[in-house]
């Protein structure tokens, strides 16, 4: 058995440092639209022989939708959390290494927006098959 964990944290102060384009321009000195100021991930992996179970948790802070950073009904997107889980099985064949992987994205069926008025998918599933040929390697 092997247990591994890692995480990331990003502080992204994406500030408009340009010049005002007009007297009404309120964007200078403000966070750029759709860029979360904070984001974080935490990943845990449990491995046993050729099996691997991965859990990934993600956080994205509030994002503004307008350059003036107004917090109105349509001027910002709320923060959200996301959880994904993956189960993977590896196989070693004479001619290739094979990987079968199934993922459940948005495990808890969270409602969230990455862009205003564009709902993102609820719970969804992915299946992957990976083949790594062993060309040029001696077969035993």
Predicted regions and their residues:
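Gram-negative outer-membrane beta-barrel transporters
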Residues: 1-64
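Residues that define the transmembrane beta-barrel architecture of outer-membrane proteins
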Residues: 34-40, 79-83, 121-125
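Residues embedded in well-ordered secondary-structure elements
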Residues: 31-33, 44, 76, 91, ...
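Glycine-rich, flexible loop segments associated with nucleotide phosphate handling
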Residues: 1, 28-30, 74-76, 96-102
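Extracellular loop and loop/strand-boundary signature of outer-membrane beta-barrel proteins
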Residues: 22-31, 70-75, 112-117
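Generic detector of contiguous secondary-structure segments
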Residues: 39-42, 67-75
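Outer membrane beta-barrel transmembrane domains
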Residues: 73, 79-88, 99
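C-terminal beta-signal and adjacent terminal beta-strands/loops
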Residues: 59-67, 87-140
